[in-house]
From Swiss-Prot:
Major enzyme class: hydrolase
Chief location: cytoplasm
Subcellular localization, as worded in the UniProt entry: Cytoplasm
EC number(s) from the headed UniProt entry: 3.1.-.-
NCBIfam families (UniProt xref): rRNA maturation RNase YbeY
Cofactor detail note: Binds 1 zinc ion.
UniProt keywords, alphabetically: Cytoplasm, Endonuclease, Hydrolase, Metal-binding, Nuclease, Ribosome biogenesis, rRNA processing, Zinc
Pfam families assigned: YbeY (PF02130)
GO molecular function: metalloendopeptidase activity; RNA endonuclease activity; zinc ion binding
Name of this protein: Endoribonuclease YbeY
Cofactor(s) in the UniProt record: Zn(2+)
Family note: Belongs to the endoribonuclease YbeY family.
Organism: Deinococcus geothermalis (strain DSM 11300 / CIP 105573 / AG-3a)
Length: 155
């Protein structure tokens, strides 16, 4: 199950796109029977969260807050929360030439990859789908591809 909490107005068509992308990525990881929450916020909120939890005073596109520790024998029904800044996602979507809806859906797959226990080197501003390389990035590329294939093509 995918819950969406919109603290900022979501772009048109986001709910079905988010559901399709995350369902595909969850299936990819074998966690389609689990739950995640996606929270849409602005730069001010995500900046405050990043400062509080990571000690970095800057906005970002996506943060993940898992409800379990990788390696624990019990994976809870709710995997955690994915927080996405619509402001940052909007700038990235414009730079990449696709819709905000598509950007948010793909960022959610990145957040899910963290929720299931994967991490990557810090690479602020480097899109995981556009040049982040190395074995630690492959799982993020795979989840992004699963999500991308579930989305309808854009005009």
């Amino acid at each position: 199950m995918i819950d969406l909490i919109a603290r900022k107005t979501p772009p048109p068509g986001l709910r079905p796109a988010l559901r399709a992308a995350l369902t595909s990525a969850m299936r990819h990881f074998g966690v389609e029977d689990r739950e995640v929450t996606v929270v849409l916020v602005g730069d001010r909120t995500i900046r405050a969260l990043k400062r509080e939890h990571w000690g970095e005073d800057a906005p970002t596109d996506v943060l993940s807050f898992p409800t379990w520790e990788p390696g624990d024998p019990f994976m809870p029904p709710h995997l955690g929360d994915i927080i996405i800044s619509l402001d940052t996602a909007g700038r990235q979507a414009a730079a990449r030439g696709h819709s905000l809806t598509r950007e948010v859906a793909l960022l959610a797959s990145h957040g899910l990859t963290h929720l299931v226990g994967h991490d990557h080197p810090h690479a602020e501003g480097l899109g995981f789908e556009e040049g982040a390389t190395g074995p630690e990035w492959q799982v993020f590329h795979d989840a992004w591809e699963a999500a991308r294939l579930a989305l309808p093509p854009e005009a």
